[in-house]
Amino acid sequence: MKLLWQAKMSSIQDWGEEVEEGAVYHVTLKRVQIQQAANKGARWLGVEGDQLPPGHTVSQYETCKIRTIKAGTLEKLVENLLTAFGDNDFTYISIFLSTYRGFASTKEVLELLLDRYGNLTGPNCEDDGSQSSPESKAVIRNAIASILRAWLDQCAEDFREPPHFPCLQKLLEYLKQMMPGSDPERRAQNLLEQFQKQDVDSDNGLLNTSSFSLEEEEELESGGSAEFTNFSEDLVAEQLTYMDAQLFKKVVPHHCLGCIWSQRDKKENKHLAPTIRATISQFNTLTKCVVSTVLGSKELKTQQRARVIEKWINIAHECRILKNFSSLRAIVSALQSNSIYRLKKAWAAVPKDRMLMFEELSDIFSDHNNHLTSRELLMKEGTSKFANLDSSVKENQKRTQRRLQLQKDMGVMQGTVPYLGTFLTDLTMLDTALQDYIEGGLINFEKRRREFEVIAQIKLLQSACNSYCMGPDQKFIQWFQRQQLLSEEESYALSCEIEAAADANTTSPKPRKSMVKRLSLLFLGSDIIPGSTPTKEQPKSAASGSSGESMDSVSVSSCESNHSEAEEGPVTPMDTPDEPQKKLSESSSSCSSIHSMDTNSSGMSSLINPLSSPPTCNNNPKIHKRSVSVTSITSTVLPPVYNQQNEDTCIIRISVEDNNGNMYKSIMLTSQDKTPAVIQRAMSKHNLESDPAEEYELVQVISEDKELVIPDSANVFYAMNSQVNFDFILRKKNSVEEQVKLRSRTSLTLPRTAKRGCWSNRHSKITL
């Protein structure tokens, strides 16, 4: 047994690095077992070892050299596409094609591949004796054919460049000349015809931007709670899953890369990543639909409103059975939003078993340990045929088992629709934490391998979605599309009309903990909204939901009626409706809601719980340019994460305390960083380079009533408090006295117009 263990341990050996001009390779040696026939006659006849009975074969081992490129110039990375298979780096082509947009364009890669390495008849090829032989040309031709076949199959969207499709035309011209009649040529020709047809249909208005658009001539009818109650819960969950699955399967995985997704706020990129935007829009529409149906009209009785809440809880449970984590999270987020959760009388009328079910569903998205629960569920059930549900409530357990048994009896297999924000968060954090280039200006390809691990999960789940056997129910989809969605102001105002705030003029409202964040904000990657940490109690928010059409704004709560740049999901601060529900509020207060981008440990928790400002605020913070991290990180060192100091690095979040200061920026901090350097980098992230750095101070938020002012001469890594959230404020030094006065005026009450995230209720300060 000991010898066997030693053999396994030594089967792969790290051999070190090989450095060539323009490239660095990592080399490992792997022992590979080979089955051979025991007698010479069988070996001479070419009989394979696995075709012989036991006892007629012998096992032999050979050492296989695996060489994987760690970093290189663009030319070397493209050249490695041709040689990777010979180096036993079998995943390189897929990794490169999925991530190369982070350092090159399709045109650059195609020109290098075809003009430099694919020109088998040019003078360069004739001068190179090693490539001029027919055998060498055949090897290169086969390698290029395999690369192009994979490119056209896996990443066809790279060639969508209407109206002329220059890269696809160049590729097709090359294939007609070098590989006439080949499979890649047929694929390229079919793809060009498909793109051209779609382009014509789009110009003629025949191509809908949404898969679920209604015909214009259909008479619109206003939906409401009365009509909503006519749909069965399993039908609603199934239709939501159908819509989510269709949208998720259309997501272009490489658009989730942090280097691409973080650029969507630029004006020239307003149409960037439309498939991701469509998924976000569906999420936000569902949250607003939940809010609208629960609030309904003022005439609804408390019991009727409670039944609508109960129905949505049951629908969320059905989504859990269908493994639709996107709609599940949207429904939970909406029910936890301020406009709904403040309805104490309605929640008090919800049956206890449904409240316990709601608590269990909320716990799925707890941000404890970097959302470990939801991640484990996704890993466990991502490609499984059925959900695996355990409930502490006996009635819920019985109901769930009946539903699952019915699915098994009918032979129905379920796919999985993930919460995309988790992946978006992970990829954004990877992009922030890992450098794009290493010493010598070489492209850091180890970073791309890490990114591909996340991309591969997305692709795997997209394939799993094909297991769903569902069709559209036009009646429900039409009702869903026709919903009169309420803005934040409207939903909160209606909520207050339904149930007036208790003693709002005499006592300050009880602070609540943030539970979830709106989807579009979670997708903002490193641009994070303050108040997102579950351990901090925040002042009261006024509303949830909005009516935006795009998601280019990061304002926590857009307060204007014309949300031209705000596509926002639910805001979810919680207030315990009554004492029986206090346990629910506390146990699920760490819940959050968004897809994804999930790195290590608690690294992504920073992106999960931004809060919303009251709707009376008139300032929408702007998204600033992404700042690429160039701090040195090697593949042998744990990447820095938020709220955790790994060796000598960590990630902190810094906001600017001013009228627009409700946006966090992630910054990687090392043990060598002094306060002035950190302030300078934070100012650069927030586009404040024109201001003198000496006018600002760095303040760590300890709690709602305590701050830690970092001295100008301090080493921030060691001066900060590592036992609390790594949240900092960049504050002008001459504004401290004014803010102290402001605190004294607002400490007794929290008016509805108080801006969330401005820390105006902080009472004390700690200085070193």
Curated annotation (Swiss-Prot):
Ranges in a coiled coil: none
Domain N-terminal Ras-GEF residues, every copy: 65-196
UniProt cross-references to CDD domains, sorted A to Z: RA_RGL, RasGEF, REM
Record-annotated Ras-associating domain positions: 648-735
Keyword match Glycoprotein: no
Gene3D superfamilies reported for this sequence: Phosphatidylinositol 3-kinase Catalytic Subunit, Chain A, domain 1, Ras guanine-nucleotide exchange factors catalytic domain, Son of sevenless (SoS) protein Chain: S domain 1
Chain residue ranges for the region called Disordered: 530-623
GO molecular function: guanyl-nucleotide exchange factor activity
Segments of skewed composition (Polar residues): 597-621
GO biological process, alphabetically ordered: small GTPase-mediated signal transduction
Domain (Ras-GEF) ranges: 232-501
Any one Pfam family match given in the protein's UniProt record, by short name: RA
Biased composition (Low complexity): 541-561, 586-596
Modified residues (Phosphoserine): S520
Keyword Phosphoprotein: yes
Keyword field: Guanine-nucleotide releasing factor, Phosphoprotein
PANTHER family per the UniProt record, alphabetical: GUANINE NUCLEOTIDE EXCHANGE FACTOR (PTHR23113), RAL GUANINE NUCLEOTIDE DISSOCIATION STIMULATOR-LIKE 1 (PTHR23113:SF199)
Subunit structure: Interacts with Ras.
Function: Probable guanine nucleotide exchange factor.
Protein's UniProt name: Ral guanine nucleotide dissociation stimulator-like 1
Gene: Rgl1
